[in-house]
A protein has these predicted regions:
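N-terminal signal peptide c-region/cleavage motif recognized by signal peptidases
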Residues: 18-20
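Alpha-helical, heptad-rich or low-complexity scaffold/stalk segments
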Residues: 24, 33-127, 136, 188, ...
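N-terminal leader/linker segments that initiate helical-solenoid repeat arrays
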Residues: 24-84, 131-172, 318-327, 331-333, ...
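Helix-turn-helix repeat elements of alpha-solenoid scaffolds
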Residues: 29-32, 57-66, 93-99, 140-144, ...
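Structural signature of alpha-solenoid helical repeat scaffolds
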Residues: 76, 110, 154-155, 190, ...
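Catalytic glycan-binding domains that act on GlcNAc-containing polysaccharides
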Residues: 86-90, 99-115, 121, 186, ...
């Protein structure tokens, strides 16, 4: 009933009053908070063993060699002794290790990742042959999750460098007419592919200046060229025609863009917008067909949005992310698995990750997905991402590995939806706690020094004493920054605007409030953001957010809102939006 009412409101383009949605029965905060303390794998070490190995690895790091020797002799057959011996033998400053000790190690440690290096060392110490080690299968790229990427610029020599710079300067100075005049003087000498690129760039410049008739006219000429820029030109033509309320032309060019798109994201976006245009033209059958095609790729924001609008259940892509009892039964016999778990128990995450990845390359390829879920259970987010993007022949990681969810929280507790924070982190730093950008943004959520100074007082800390690379501290500052953006009068709590502000800052966001001609339509706002980076950022972070909601098997108020032309609001700490959805007057 409610969905039908919202759809009718969208179809007639009416201004709708705020509607109250039933509070969702599931939330992301409960799921991700529970994971922090969840014991997902059996403990491998006793309390005494954990204490022993912590002191042993600390002694190795501190180059206390006499103590290392003594402690190694105390537990010669311990689960982590071979790893510790390898770290000791291969340390740059450790005492010389002779051949008998190396050969002894190779008899028990041949399945460890250090075996190849120790085998080479044994040859230098006089071994007559290389050790017989397990075959380490090479990994192959598995590709990445789809994202909207701009086609590569055509560099075939037909566009002179000085003319390129001059046209781009006109575009950056909000002078599309000047850019078109320059292009007109060189257009005939461009290659077909270069012609498509530069006509598209000028067409987009007209569009972001709200010169829709000029944008449409220019974009319609892009098809005279060739290559991947043609689909981008058709996309601009569709958007410009939409804003001109020419649904027939918009539908035609969105369908052209979808047919020619090399990017799954552009294809899904064009199909979705084509469906909107067809519905505006009162062509429901065509609209449904295009929407169904868009929904076929649930890895994209628009694919998930189309499925939501159709009422389709999304496939189980990331919903079964947790390490299961069945997973444990399939890998528990592998000694390296037990070693990786034990290393995680004593805080040796880097070594644990190395052992786990090595096992993934020497073990049964059928266990690769289970091992990727084990990486999640052990809180190895970067290992998860590596396994998502790389796998030996015949193996494939769990798709949820593209969306790690580490067992962390801000030092002052979660105040925002953890799924939203993770969605930003994945794009900002790929969960690298020591990441630093060229602009000196730092840590998981890429916090700048000025942001530290801005929020330190409200967090009750001294800016000069903050270790922004500490994940719990970084999360607290990132969370506070999101809250500040939520409360800013310009964003009015609108989630897409807040996402854009996190990337671009409030200065352009405030300017865009009057510059972006979106008719109150949130999707049109997202597609008309002038900055390419920010436009892509919002779409990617929104996609990430929905994937994390799916991972938690939680409902998605923001996806429901956008599917009904509503502005999704910033969620509360539980992932809910307090039941509020503000409807736009922007069309279908």
């Amino acid at each position: 009933m409610l969905k039908n009412a919202l759809t009718l409101c969208a179809l007639v383009g009416a201004v709708c009053t705020p509607l109250s949605l039933k509070a969702q029965e599931q939330n992301t905060r409960t799921y991700f908070t529970a994971r922090i303390t969840a014991q997902e794998v059996p403990q491998q070490l006793s309390s005494d063993e954990r204490d022993h190995y912590r002191r042993l690895f600390s002694a190795i790091e501190g180059e206390q060699w006499a103590e290392v020797e003594a402690m190694l002799s105390q537990r010669p057959g311990g689960l982590l002794t071979d790893v510790a011996r390898a770290e000791y033998y291969l340390h740059a400053n450790s005492p010389r290790v002779e051949l008998p000790a190396l050969l002894d190690w190779l008899r028990s440690g041949q399945n460890l990742p250090q075996a190849e290096q120790i085998g080479r060392l044994s040859i230098t110490r006089g071994a007559t042959s290389a050790p017989n080690l397990p075959y380490v299968r090479p990994t192959q790229s598995q590709g990445s999750m789809p994202r909207r990427t701009r086609p590569s610029s055509i560099d075939d020599g037909t566009m002179p460098a000085e003319m390129r710079s001059a046209i781009l300067e006109r575009i950056s100075n909000d002078d599309p007419f000047g850019a078109r005049q320059l292009l007109d003087g060189i257009d005939a000498s461009l290659s077909s592919a270069a012609r498509a690129e530069w006509r598209q760039r000028v067409a987009w410049s007209f569009f972001i200046e709200n010169l829709d008739a000029e944008a449409l006219a220019m974009a319609q000429t892009v098809g005279a060229g060739s290559g991947s820029w043609v689909a981008e030109g058709d996309w601009v033509a569709g958007l410009a025609a939409w804003r001109l309320n020419d649904c027939q032309t918009a539908s035609e060019y969105f369908q052209r863009s979808a047919a020619g798109a090399a990017s799954p994201n552009l294809r899904a976006a064009a199909l979705y917008w084509g469906s909107r245009a067809a519905m505006r033209c009162r062509q429901p059958d065509l609209s449904t067909r295009l929407l169904t095609n868009a929904a076929s790729d649930d890895r994209t924001m628009y694919g998930m949005l189309a499925a939501e609008q159709l009422g389709q259940r999304l496939p189980n892509r990331v919903e079964s992310a947790d390490f299961s009892q069945e997973d444990w039964r399939s890998v528990q016999s592998e000694r390296n698995v037990r070693i990786a778990i034990a290393l995680a128990e004593i805080g040796q995450d880097n070594l644990g990750s190395q052992v786990l990845l090595h096992q993934a390359r020497i073990g049964d390829p059928r266990n690769y997905a289970a091992l990727s879920r084990l990486a999640r259970a052990l809180d190895f987010p970067q290992t998860q991402l590596f396994m998502a993007y790389n796998a030996p022949s015949g193996a494939q990681a769990d798709p949820a590995s593209h969306f790690p969810s580490p067992k962390i929280a801000p030092y002052n507790g979660w105040r925002v939806d953890p799924a939203l924070a993770f969605a930003h982190i994945l794009q900002e730093s790929a969960f690298r706690p020591n990441a630093t950008s060229p602009a000196n943004a730092q840590g998981l959520m890429q916090i700048t020094p000025i942001t530290v100074r801005q929020h330190a007082p409200s967090l009750g800390v001294s800016a000069s004493q903050v270790n922004i690379y500490d994940p719990e501290i970084n999360l607290a500052f990132g969370q506070r920054n999101l809250e500040m953006l939520r409360d800013h009068p310009t964003t009015r709590g609108r989630l897409p605007v807040i996402m854009a502000a996190y990337n671009a800052g409030m200065t352009p966001i405030t300017r865009w409030e009057s510059e972006i001609r979106d008719f109150g339509d949130p999707l049109l706002y997202m597609e008309a953001i002038p900055y390419w980076e920010t436009r892509g950022y919002v779409a990617i972070v929104m996609r990430n957010y929905w994937m994390y909601e799916r991972q938690a098997n939680a409902a998605s108020p923001s996806r429901m809102a956008l599917a009904q032309n509503g502005w999704p609001l910033f969620p509360d700490g539980n992932g809910l939006n307090n039941g509020r959805v503000y409807m736009s007057a922007g069309g279908n």
